[in-house]
Amino acid sequence: MSDAQNAKTVNEAASVQPDENHVIAERREKLKAIREQGVAFPNDFRPEHIAQSLHDSYDAVEAEALESQALGVAIAGRMMLKRVMGKASFATVQDRSGRIQIFITRENVGEATYDAFKKWDLGDIIAARGTLFKTKTGELSVKVSELRLLTKSLRPLPEKFHGLADQETKYRQRYVDLIVSEETRKTFVARSKIVAAIRAFMLSHEFLEVETPMLHPIPGGAAAKPFITHHNALDLQMYMRIAPELYLKRLVVGGFERVFEINRNFRNEGLSVRHNPEFTMMEFYAAYTDYKWLMDFTESCIRAAAIAACGSAVVEYQGRELDLGKPFERLTIIGAIQKYAPQYTLEQLSDQAFLRQELKKFGVEALPHLGLGALQLALFEETAESQLWNPTYIIDYPVEVSPLARASDSDPSITERYELFITGREIANGFSELNDAEDQAARFHAQVAAKEAGDDEAMYYDGDFIRALEYGMPPTGGCGIGIDRLVMLLTDSPSIRDVILFPHMRPEH
């Protein structure tokens, strides 16, 4: 613990909070006085060091050796702690890498600067030049010879965010959360590393990164409700994309045999701990592969992300260990139901009337047009999905719920499709792609019929995509990985809002 922390902190957010409006008014008066003295927000200081690199390089150096070297440093950051003691003071400065303590004396910085410093507040952004030394307690610190105020903070920082009462504030004012919570900062640094590792993995396997439209004339590529907007110049109703799939497959038709995209999808659906209407997905397509190749490849990609974020393929999520280094289990939908809900017989699982009655017990009202495969999938979602804690591929999805996937040669009622579940959540969805234009057109027509029967998540008919397939698409495998859910897993975050910098919120007023 630093010397600044050992003493009573001069902190507006003490146990007895003053009226925030009063504090803001006081700070505005201070800013007014600073403006009258000259440049209130200077921009001519350039830090030469960051806190963490100084700790890494000099924490282990003995005090005498450090003093003899007289190492000059220049740092800048936000003042998080402050302790004034007559003619000498300590403060803690936080930059992008961490925190370091500074030591200020009237003798070293001059009377005018020292008197000004005493009026500065927590949250102010300051700059300091000086030399490194160790305090009596062994704390690496900067003995300041030059001190400047770069930005006056008008709002007091909270002492901390604590408990569920402040959860909404954390999401709504993420900028404050990032200032005061090291855990939050670590989460989003890890997210950046995960995305970078996935991108590097894809590029190392000769995939081409592309960007496809966010505004679609016809929504497609997934079963979901779209957001609708209007293109004024074209006087055209358009849809925020729910998936990039159909455009990426057009690129495979065009000869880009390995493509991927990391970008946003938008689905006009509910909010939950695992759903945000705006979310990040990586989709990739590889010609001359199938769903079995994809499963092996997806495993390797997720392991690479885990090692980048956690340093190991063995991670902990919500107090339980997960080994992403072991081969992932593979089960059919029926196999998963029988494993996790063994009370059901094969005969019952093949009886549509029974399945409809059983689903009612879970509060699921199955639409009349749903066939056996869709009913089996619905029962799987109610009985087995949440129990798939360890990485598990659910394979062989019914054709009727997989309108873009290739049917199995051995059983045309199922497709060469998988979904990957970890901790009871879907992380990835992939399949051998349907490249038969006539079969795809027939499935689109079936989706249109389902939409007319009341299924508002069924797909539209996309004539241009059919035209693309008619030019010929090679045998192809494709997969989508939910980046947000993967980041949740690898950062031990219980809610998707914890891994999205600015999640959707209701208006404050």
Curated annotation (Swiss-Prot):
| UniProt-recorded Gene Ontology molecular function terms | ATP binding; lysine-tRNA ligase activity; magnesium ion binding; tRNA binding
Coiled-coil regions listed in the entry = none
- Which UniProt key words apply to this protein? Aminoacyl-tRNA synthetase, ATP-binding, Cytoplasm, Ligase, Magnesium, Metal-binding, Nucleotide-binding, Protein biosynthesis
Detail which positions bind Mg(2+) 1: 419, 426
Annotated residues that bind Mg(2+) 2 are located at 426
Major site of localization recorded for this protein: cytoplasm
Which compartments is it annotated to reside in?
Cytoplasm
The UniProt entry's GO CC annotations, sorted and at most eight, read:
cytosol
**Cofactor section:** Mg(2+)
GO biological processes: lysyl-tRNA aminoacylation
Keyword Nucleotide-binding (UniProt): yes
Q: Which reaction is the catalytic activity of this chain? A: tRNA(Lys) + L-lysine + ATP = L-lysyl-tRNA(Lys) + AMP + diphosphate
Question: What Gene3D superfamilies is this protein classified in?
Answer: Bira Bifunctional Protein, Domain 2 (3.30.930.10), Nucleic acid-binding proteins (2.40.50.140)
Question: How many cofactors are bound and how?
Answer: Binds 3 Mg(2+) ions per subunit.
Q: What is its EC number?
A: 6.1.1.6
Query: What family is this protein classified in?
Result: Belongs to the class-II aminoacyl-tRNA synthetase family.
Subunit structure of this chain's protein: Homodimer.
The record, for NCBIfam families, names:
lysS_bact, PRK00484.1
Q: What is this protein called?
A: Lysine--tRNA ligase
* Native organism: Methylobacillus flagellatus (strain ATCC 51484 / DSM 6875 / VKM B-1610 / KT)
The protein's gene is named lysS
